[in-house]
A protein has these predicted regions:
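Alpha-helical "hinge/linker" immediately C-terminal to small N-terminal DNA-binding modules
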Residues: 1-19
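N-terminal Rossmann-like NAD(P) cofactor-binding module of classical short-chain dehydrogenase/reductase
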Residues: 3, 77, 175
């Protein structure tokens, strides 16, 4: 009976160890741009952590693209194609940008009804000092303009989240990713079909 108990216990331990080997464990470092990380990824990471309790997650939010090949991070969620093209890539979501303004600003300056109406408005653009998290953050400045001209800006901000706050405070209009505006007060989509 004792030999059978020992063998049974060994099999139990073996099964337990086998189960642990098949479950992911260790540290996982994920990087993405600041705005996507703080507003989209952070609220969603809890589900992953519940499914993988043995994984310690580290989130690095930086608008500079970290180099995965030098192990600065294990996973990168990029808003555009990474510079190092030898990565395994998978599209996660479509990110749409629209032009937004605050109700206070739009009441004072009017609601644009056409692309040409945008020429009468103040614009906030993505500024210098930090790399843009997307390919063309200031597309709205050229929208409908001829000869590659741009609309004049009244303010530049080197953070997409900063653009949102400037728009909400009534400084002007700006192109902002839709994921950043969900459930945000004091913001209205302008020309929603553009």
């Amino acid at each position: 009976k004792t030999a059978h108990e020992v063998i049974s216990k060994l099999k139990e331990v073996e099964t337990t160890l086998g189960d642990k080997k098949n479950k992911p464990s260790g540290k996982l470092t994920v990087t993405t741009v600041v705005s996507l990380g703080t507003t989209w990824l952070t609220p969603r990471i809890q589900e992953f952590m519940q499914l993988n309790p043995e994984i310690e997650v580290e989130l690095i939010f930086d608008d500079k693209e970290l180099d995965l090949s030098t192990r600065q991070a294990d996973i990168g969620i990029f808003m555009r194609r990474p510079k190092q093209l030898n990565y395994i890539q998978k599209k996660l979501i479509d990110i749409n940008y629209h032009i937004y303004g605050s109700p206070k600003y739009l009441e004072k300056h009017g609601y644009p009804k056409t692309v040409n109406d945008l020429n009468k408005h103040n614009f906030i653009s993505f500024g210098r000092g930090a790399p843009s998290p997307v390919y063309n953050p200031d597309w709205a400045l050229k929208l409908g303009m001829k000869d590659n001209k741009k609309r004049k800006t009244v303010m530049r901000v080197n953070s997409v989240y900063g653009l949102l706050l400037a728009v909400q405070s009534g400084v002007g209009l700006a192109a902002i990713p839709d994921y950043l505006t969900v459930k945000q007060p004091n913001i209205v989509k302008v020309l929603p079909n553009v």
